[in-house]
Amino acid sequence: PCVKIATAFEPLKRGKNPSIKPDELPEFFDKLINSNTDLLTKYLIQWQLLTMVRPNEAVTAEWTDIDEDKELWVIPAHKMKQTKANENISHIVPLSKQALSLLKKIKSLSSHKSYLFYSSRSRDGYLNSQTANKAIRDNMGYKDRQTAHGMRKIASTYLHEKGVIPDVIEMCL
């Protein structure tokens, strides 16, 4: 009865959020820097890589959520994925030196607005959550190889390879 068991299961397909390998990041950054992508969008992509957040969490980041003195970004529960939002748990993101340095650059462009990644063309006041995907796909040539959400996978893969405890990685994500 188990002879044809393999046909009962679909082979695993590459997910809808593909990602490059961590060792491909230098080339990715080189393409990002040299692309014709808008500067704020470049910063958005870097911010997502440095903070390991979902695209929507990144674009809806507000200056009031950032505590530069404590070097933290507190994402309110209502902006989180449904599971955390239902538990009313804010997500606390410690900001690395690199993230804080990037924050200064972002501030030079958007400190006078509510959102880090503001958009004057959006009725919501911030960039569309697909903005990074469009840049990665169209301006950088990573169609079907990398998505904005897939950047979380790069971080997770890297941390797993470095031997970080899986529960700690999950808490970061």
Residue spans for each PLM region:
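Short, polar N-cap/turn motifs at the start of nucleic acid-interacting alpha helices
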Residues: 65-72, 143-145, 164-173
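C-terminal catalytic core of tyrosine-transesterase DNA break-rejoin enzymes
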Residues: 46, 50-57, 131, 135, ...
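Bulky hydrophobic/aromatic "packing anchor" residues in well-ordered structure
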Residues: 1-3, 117, 156
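Basic, Lys/Arg- and aromatic-enriched nucleic-acid-binding interface segment
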Residues: 1-61, 69, 109, 151-152
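Active-site/catalytic core of tyrosine-dependent DNA strand-transfer enzymes
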Residues: 19-26, 70, 96-144, 150, ...
